[in-house]
Amino acid sequence: MKRKLLLVGRMRYSLPLSPSLAQKFDALSEELDVHVLASDAGGSGEDARFRLVRGVRPRVLDGPSFYALLPFRVAREIRELRPDAVLAQGAQEAALANLGRRLARVPTCVIADIHGDPAAPTRLYGSSLRKALAPCADWLAKRGLRGADGVRTISAYTSGVVRGAGVEPTATFAAFMDLEPFLETRPRPLPQPPVALFVGVLERYKAVDVLAAAWRLAAPQVPDATLHLVGRGSLRDVAGQLVAELPEQTRWTEVLPTPDVARALDEATVLVLPSRSEGLGRVVVEAFCRGRGVVASRVGGIPDIVEDGTTGLLVAPGDATALAGALVRALSERGLTERLGASARVAVEPWLAAPEEYARQIRDLVEKVCGTKPG
């Protein structure tokens, strides 16, 4: 009989699932009896595996409401489903899931699923008002990691974060990434004139402000080059101002479907990712699939993927001058970017895991944790 697993997190899902998410959950369902407690992103479909929570208005209350009620919702799901394990995406979520387990008074394992630095969301994401929540979030994260029956990490960096809290990871393996749209065709030659591409949310943790400052320094040195920004977020004014100042050398697209992101990478010389915090950097793997090198900050999980001078150029986080210098090199030295791109395409091979392999790793994690937890 399959183990029963409850996935818990703030992730937003729309039903019916997209083809890539359908692959992931269908593979998981082959190995485990999977159920999901998460947020509703809209949609008119139905899937018995999903219990999605609708948002509340005003939007500023949506997050606090979700987390305040999460222990009670987890407790309800545990009582109804009797899962063998709860996989909580995030350290704070693991603490709240552990509280839900106590409320339910049902024996089940709680596994913390760590994809980044638990301290980052209240310091670098969204509104500055989040900073006031940092002490509470830090306390919750520590309780979540230390109270979990197991911890899964996705990289050497996230493993280091967990060990810093005095906890040894139970397993380390990458998140499932549907890379098929980025592998359907062979990488295209680098474009001419050169283009630097940024893909991500326009938030402080992605350091869009640093990128804007760097581009003001770099643009005059590479007058035929363009910076293409893809994303939206609370720092949209930073992007808008940059386009207004350098309209001939800056483009901004708020939303691109996944196939169009692949095309944007083909039309780019290099990807730029100047983050202040980054768990892994999925877009780096996508860029590697398209044979593109990366200019990025030496922070978080980025150095776990990008080898400085081989598959990309790494600079100190927050250093606009160093970032500008790296961009000028990448956009003016075609031989360098061709070499970085060729090495990147080779380096991506270990990341090309099928959904079935990911599902088996999750199953093995659940078996390992449930098998070692005292009854």
Please identify what each model-predicted range represents.
Residues 1-43, 374:
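N-terminal subdomain of nucleotide-sugar transferases
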Residues 6, 152, 188-206, 212-216, ...:
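Conserved donor-binding/catalytic core segment of Leloir-type glycosyltransferases
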